[in-house]
Regions:
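Short, well-ordered coil/turn segments that N-cap beta-strands
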Residues: 11-16, 43-46, 71-75, 111-115, ...
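Active-site groove signature of glycoside hydrolases
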Residues: 106-124
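Short, acidic/polar
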Residues: 27-39, 93-109, 157-161
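Acidic (Asp/Glu)-rich catalytic clusters
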Residues: 8, 64-73, 106-110, 139, ...
Length: 321
């Protein structure tokens, strides 16, 4: 797998990342083991998780498998803090919560440091200075090597990065993790140009448009899919409108012409977008992951890229354009 810099840092990572949000829930330990084996075999290095995934079980499972595969020195472990499941306050980026959450993540992952520690979301209740101070403390302690953001808006990203860059002795933020796909290109309005200006890299989550870009929902809803589950159907149905249908149809046509799957084409398109480091592959099964990893070998012709750009155009307006 080809390598890329992890934002403005000295770390290089594979240009596809392994997501683990389903681990400990719909992905059991056997599938997770197969996924990690396939990812490592493909040359992947960046593995993304979060303290709230499966109420911490995900981090525990990842830590167990890293030990089993004896691969700690060859992988880049990224996790997140801030989110609070099943509580009235959804996000907590206070110093106390962050540092306690970090210690719990280290214990569950069974590692002595986190390579990339990401703030999962913006917390409207906590002063940004306090959040950034906690990041500095974590890095100074050796428990964290680098830090990044997730789901920050354009102005939030710019403010956080600028404050870190201007504060003597602080370590700049190096990444932002955002939803980004052919179906969701809103980040191109402010996040992408901000990332370029600030020297941060983009890690796209849900690069297959919540599964819709695989094409499996074109004609019906598979009974074993997230689209059929009462708990997750709303997550998928966001992309059930006519615009999404046109994009998926165009993607399927392009894939047929390239003798590839729609998923491979969608991932290759996103992988090559400006500022992108590595789309995060959050597969439920190893078969799904293997299909997604096939995109590493696919290079899109310019005319296919242009056609996909056109059909999925986010329609920039004032003041972006």
């Amino acid at each position: 797998m080809q390598q890329r810099p992890l934002g403005n840092s000295g770390i290089r990572v594979g240009r596809l990342a392994l997501g683990t949000m389903t681990w400990g829930r719909t992905t059991d330990e056997y599938e997770a083991r197969d996924q990690l084996a396939a990812f490592l075999d493909a040359g992947g290095t960046l593995i993304d998780t979060a303290d709230v995934y499966a109420e911490g079980v995900c981090e525990e499972l990842l830590g167990t498998l890293i030990q089993e595969f004896d691969c700690r020195d060859s992988v880049v472990v990224a996790t997140k803090a801030v989110s609070l499941p099943n509580t009235e306050r959804r996000f907590n980026a206070s110093r106390g919560h962050l540092l306690d959450a970090l210690d719990r993540s280290l214990k569950r992952l069974d590692v002595d440091h986190i390579d990339l520690w990401q703030m999962h979301a913006w917390d409207t209740y906590t002063p940004l200075e306090e959040t950034l101070s906690a990041i500095d403390s974590a890095i100074a302690s050796g428990k964290v090597r680098y830090a990044g953001m997730s789901n920050y808006s354009g102005w939030q990203s710019a403010r956080a990065c600028t404050m870190q860059q201007l504060k003597p002795g602080s370590t700049p933020l190096i990444t932002t993790q955002m939803e980004y796909s052919l179906l969701e290109r809103g980040v191109e309005r402010e996040i992408v140009p901000a990332a370029k200006s600030l020297g941060i890299g983009i890690l796209p989550w849900s690069p297959l448009g919540r599964g819709v870009l695989t094409g499996k929902y074109r004609h019906s809803i598979p009974i074993d899919s997230r689209g059929a589950s009462p708990d997750t159907s709303a997550f998928v149905n966001l992309y059930s409108d006519e615009r999404a249908k046109r994009i998926v149809d165009a993607l399927a046509t392009a894939a047929q012409g390239l003798d590839a799957s729609p998923a491979e084409v969608a991932l290759a398109w996103l992988r090559d977008r400006p500022g992108v480091i590595a789309p995060i592959l959050g597969a439920r099964t190893n078969a799904q992951l293997l299909l997604a990893l096939g995109s590493e070998e696919l290079e899109l012709p310019e005319e296919i890229t242009a056609a996909l750009n056109d059909i999925s155009d986010p329609h920039m307006g004032y003041p972006e354009s």
